[in-house]
């Protein structure tokens, strides 16, 4: 079964700052929980993403067991959106659409992840027992880190 995870977060910065941060693969380790041991393995010439870009990672999502993960950037609309698609990794399907909407308060970040686990019924069981909760925790951690990075000096309304 295909699942969808959607998150929004308003950050207090300009579109160029948001794009530069989120489109740089090396920043993923900053917004991923430390216990996942997320490491970008691809040596990147610079931080500019492009369609067709392949990025290799190592991550330990469960029981501290390292797994290889490879994504391809399948779509880029400069300073508006990009999509990463898992080519190799733990999911049967992983498609993450990142959208950036400039507004009077800075930038609204929208994440839409479409994903499916392998192994049919067993994958669905794993999803209901721990995978969904783990993904929500990862995006919750990310939200907290981004609040500190971008919104700590925001004036209360």
Locate the predicted segments by residue.
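Short, surface-exposed coil-to-beta transition loops
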Residues: 4-6, 66-70, 92-96
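Glycine-rich portal/gate segments that line the openings of hydrophobic small-molecule binding cavities
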Residues: 40-88, 141-144, 148-149, 153-154
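Beta-strand/loop substructures that line and gate deep hydrophobic ligand-binding cavities in soluble
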Residues: 86-137
């Amino acid at each position: 079964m295909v699942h969808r995870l959607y998150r929004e977060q308003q950050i207090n910065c300009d579109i160029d700052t948001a794009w530069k941060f989120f489109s740089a693969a090396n920043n993923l380790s900053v917004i991923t929980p430390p216990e996942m041991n997320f490491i970008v393995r691809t040596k990147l010439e610079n931080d500019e993403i492009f369609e067709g870009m392949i990025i290799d990672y190592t991550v330990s999502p469960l029981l501290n067991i390292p797994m290889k993960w490879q994504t391809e950037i399948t779509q880029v609309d400069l300073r508006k959106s990009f999509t990463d698609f898992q080519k190799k990794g733990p999911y049967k399907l992983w498609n993450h659409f990142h959208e950036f909407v400039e507004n009077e308060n800075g930038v609204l970040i929208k994440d839409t992840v479409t994903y499916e686990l392998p192994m049919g019924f067993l994958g669905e069981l794993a999803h209901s027992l721990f995978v969904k909760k783990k993904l929500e925790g990862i995006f919750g951690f990310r939200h907290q880190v981004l609040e500190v990075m971008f919104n700590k000096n925001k004036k209360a309304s």
